[in-house]
Amino acid sequence: MTAVLELRDVCAEYGPFRALFGVSLRIDPGEAVALVGSNGAGKTTVARVASGLLAPSSGSVTVDGEDMTGARIYKFARAGVAHAVEGRSVFATLAVEENLTLSFRRVHGRAGVKPSLERAYELFPVLGRRRGQIAGTLSGGEQRMLSLARVMVEVPKVLIADELSLGLAPVIVDELYETLTRLRTEGTSLLIIEQQVSHALALADRVAILDHGNVSWLGDSSEAKAVVHQAFEPA
């Protein structure tokens, strides 16, 4: 089976600082993989490399078997890789619909805007009700929904969700993970990157533990629960 997204022996650097040391990770079609680790382990760097935001210094990245190493982020997006970045990635002074339109037009042109808007409002009805509201005045949870909707140009092959629960109330986190579950039933593969891991473990098929830029453990979710909770959950 060809992986929908695969990193092989990836190293990544920020200037003189090396963040990843030979990371290998694959996500198969329809699979959910959780990437967990402590703060500073390199999780967000993996996400950046996997979506084209950061070119690896060595190693390779493939999407559906096609070599995408060093390609620009828009090429990853057109290949079906969606990346919901950590935090609230919105244009704070623009309306909700303007945020979405800018993102959708960049990837698929004018023709792709209307169906993408319809899908965004179907996934997140609250955004449809607030389409004319300035994004910076939305609640934290609504801004996170907007940042996730911005990458949902269509049903992606793989969605990279980076720290989806960060700073949000539990009820909002539940709503966001319900959306991830729905996307998965529609065929989207998931790379879920979390420091607070309970939701990710419940959804994942496999779990990778990242430690100081290395994958220190990789296995089935059922086998990972005890070791992950011991390592990363508060006592």
Annotate each PLM feature.
Residues 159-163:
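Catalytic Walker B motif of ABC-type/P-loop ATPase nucleotide-binding domains
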Residues 55, 67-87, 110-117, 129-132, ...:
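ABC ATPase NBD coupling module
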Residues 151-152:
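ABC ATPase C-loop
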Residues 15, 71-73, 96-115, 123-128, ...:
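ABC-type ATPase nucleotide-binding domains, specifically the catalytic core motifs of the NBD
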Residues 36-38:
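The feature captures the beta-strand-to-loop junction immediately N-terminal to the Walker
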Residues 51:
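Helix-to-loop junction immediately C-terminal to a conserved catalytic motif
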Residues 134-138:
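Conserved ABC ATPase signature
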